Amino acid sequence: MKSLGKIALTAIAAASVSIALSGPVSAQALDLRLSVESTPGASTQQMLAAFRDALKEEMGDGVNIEYFDSGTLGDEIVHMQQVRTGQLDVIPIGSDAVQLDSKFAVFDIPFLFSDRDQVASVLDGEMGAALDKSFQENAGLKILGFGEIGFRNITNNVRPIVTPADLKGVKLRTPGSKTRIMSFQMLGASPIKMNIGEVYLAMEQGVIDGQENPYGNIAKWSWDEVQKYISKSKHVYTPITFVMNLNRYNSLTDAQREAVHKAARTAVESSRQYGADNDANLEQVIRERSPDVQFNDIDSASFQEVAKEIGAEIGKIAGEDFTAQFLAAATK
């Protein structure tokens, strides 16, 4: 099968944008609409902007880009509806990808990945290609590549999370993924679905006790200002599923696809490096900004038994054969 890198490059042919540039790729300019819910600096916005800029450079006057961010056109769920109907051409999708294709539930299996090299090996290989094929069939979307939201950590105001027992009764904000909610219920927490923009105030007012996200989001949204504990769990790795409307993709010329292909690969690499840099730098930024926040490691062995049970339940949702193949690829 094609590697995800090749898939990403091929798919980028569908992602042109509406800002005039220099360097023609085709006689007729390609018009594209790009949008993201998040604000500048967030991982999904960073990836979409990197794609926009790379495509401009590649296509010049051959592309016109209409670009929106900061939720101008709605939240991620609305964006998914718009890209499927053709109102948008290219968007990044975070945890909500599972709402379009149950195979994406595998990403909610705890401790599936241990490092970024392992992630790249799986997503840039046959399993990434399988997810692309499934997304085309089930959602009408072409995956151009997989970027990074990152490894998620737990923050809260109740106690340090060291073992699953420490999660008991903790009101934890999660994304809308049913499998993420199920996972934390099985771990003993009380997960609450909530829009990310509401989290700070909800923590401040005690509506929720905490949340789980990579350092990039913790720092960007300043949640450390209203949290006492950050537990370095790295319990789940969340990719960015970078997609284009399939009909739009299929309408591209070979030259346009090649340009999109190159720009998407640039965006994938930029996104992954951005995530790695955030992990390397932002813990220290948070420590200096919020010296009263307590950091701790978890006892990962104590989570493993429950993680196996969660994996078995998620396998029923994602498909047992597919889940087995994915787990095998992740443990090579």
What kind of feature is each model-predicted range?
Residues V122-D132:
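Signature of the catalytic double-stranded beta-helix
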Residues M1-A11:
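Bacterial N-terminal signal peptides that target proteins for export
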Residues L21-A27:
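Sec/Tat signal peptide C-region and signal peptidase I cleavage site
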Residues T10-I12, Q28-Q118, M127, Q136-K332:
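N-terminal secretory/targeting leader peptides
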Residues V17, L131-Q136:
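Short, solvent-exposed secondary-structure boundary motifs
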Residues T10-A20:
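Bacterial N-terminal signal peptides
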